[in-house]
Amino acid sequence: MKDWLDSVNWNADGLVPAIAQDATSGRILMMAWMNRESLRLTAEKQQAIYWSRSRNQLWHKGETSGHVQHVREIRLDCDEDVIVLQVVQEGGIACHTGRESCFYRVFRNGEWVAVDPVLKDPAEIY
């Protein structure tokens, strides 16, 4: 029997991009990387666990901040090389900047403009 993880088209580093999407609103919250172990653990625990390329270790989202992502559904795209996690974001903050989403800047008139408020000072989170 084929392991379901073998269906994922992992990159040369054994990673796949994973997009966290709010399960209710559909808003994109963040993008991170997953390896086989983090995707397996995410499916098992129903909480988002990513692979930190900078720390070279598993990263259980919310372990430090309390902003855990509860996974409602895991999707694989048609090319099998991108994962979407539909999540319920505990605390309403996904971004390390203290915002709901990491995608808080909009390109307007030739520059990037922050359009989403900081919900909590990152110094109070970390």
From Swiss-Prot:
One of its GO terms (biological process) is L-histidine biosynthetic process. Signal peptide: none annotated. It catalyses: 1-(5-phospho-beta-D-ribosyl)-5'-AMP + H2O = 1-(5-phospho-beta-D-ribosyl)-5-[(5-phospho-beta-D-ribosylamino)methylideneamino]imidazole-4-carboxamide. GO terms for cellular component: cytoplasm. It comes from the Bacteria. Keywords: Amino-acid biosynthesis, Cytoplasm, Histidine biosynthesis, Hydrolase, Magnesium, Metal-binding, Zinc. Zn(2+) binds at C78, C95, C102. Its main location: cytoplasm. Its EC number is 3.5.4.19. Mg(2+) binds at D77, D79, D81. Pathway: Amino-acid biosynthesis; L-histidine biosynthesis; L-histidine from 5-phospho-alpha-D-ribose 1-diphosphate: step 3/9. InterPro entries: PRA-CH, PRib_AMP_CycHydrolase_dom, PRib_AMP_CycHydrolase_sf. GO terms for molecular function: magnesium ion binding; phosphoribosyl-AMP cyclohydrolase activity; zinc ion binding. It holds the Pfam family PRA-CH. Its cofactor is Mg(2+); Zn(2+). The keyword NADP does not apply. It is found in: Cytoplasm. PANTHER family: HISTIDINE BIOSYNTHESIS BIFUNCTIONAL PROTEIN, HISTIDINE BIOSYNTHESIS BIFUNCTIONAL PROTEIN HIS7. Catalyzes the hydrolysis of the adenine ring of phosphoribosyl-AMP. Belongs to the PRA-CH family. NCBIfam families: PRK00051.1 (NF000768). This is Phosphoribosyl-AMP cyclohydrolase. It comes from Cellvibrio japonicus (strain Ueda107) (Pseudomonas fluorescens subsp. cellulosa). The lineage of its organism: Bacteria, Pseudomonadati, Pseudomonadota, Gammaproteobacteria, Cellvibrionales.
